[in-house]
Amino acid sequence: SVFSALADAELMRIEAAIENCGADVDIESKPGGILEVEFDDGSKIIINRHTAAREIWVAARSGGFHFRPQEGGWIAGRDGAELYATLSRLVSEQAGAAVTLQAE
């Protein structure tokens, strides 16, 4: 589907952004549009494509977040937060170091 292609391309950008952010994390891409980010303390952030809802879902220690494609980005329905801004905050929290993620 068009959505799956869009989401998969975004997941690849997210993976590259996390790999290049300088944080000491392990990132693994799994089948079905899933990224698993593991931190030194054993905590994880899971980022996945949710095709039925047409969203990218993020599960972190501080909660779950759902993002929809709009205006060239991915925006949370709940509070209007942008995907990369949210991921920067979540990765920073769990890595214990300030990290800024940007889409390439």
Show which residues each predicted segment covers.
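N-terminal intrinsically disordered, cationic/polar leader segments
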Residues: 1-104
